Amino acid sequence: MEPITVKYKVLDARAKVPAYATPGAAAADLCAVLDAPLTVAPMQRVLVPTGLAIELPGAHSVALVYARSGRSIKHGLCMANGVGVVDSDYRGELKVPMVNLGAEAYTIQPGERVAQLCIAPVYIAAFVPAEELGDTQRGVGGFGSTGK
């Protein structure tokens, strides 16, 4: 598959270009642009700047920002909003909202990889009212209805 072009603008000279850590990586790493190390106390939320803005290739694409799995499981450093959604028409700085769900403080170093940026297609839906919805095996069952 040919890579799609995502333009980026450097807003801070210390910013690092998003980079894929391995040839099979689905997301590129985003790095923190900080003046000094940033210590995040347990349950504290912070907004981490990246020093970058991007231009997605069209209205049918989105950039999704995810936590790095190692930071999440080892230190409890997660996305404060679960997943960041960067719309195709946004041109501001990419910032990473993070929360420390761990029991100990975690210090983010300047230049540290703090999140992952995944570019994905978007389907624009035409929402149509309906009196009835089609039947499925699952039906209205939710929240554990399909078993463990």
Regions found by a protein language model. Name each.
Residues M1-K148:
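DUTPase catalytic domain/fold
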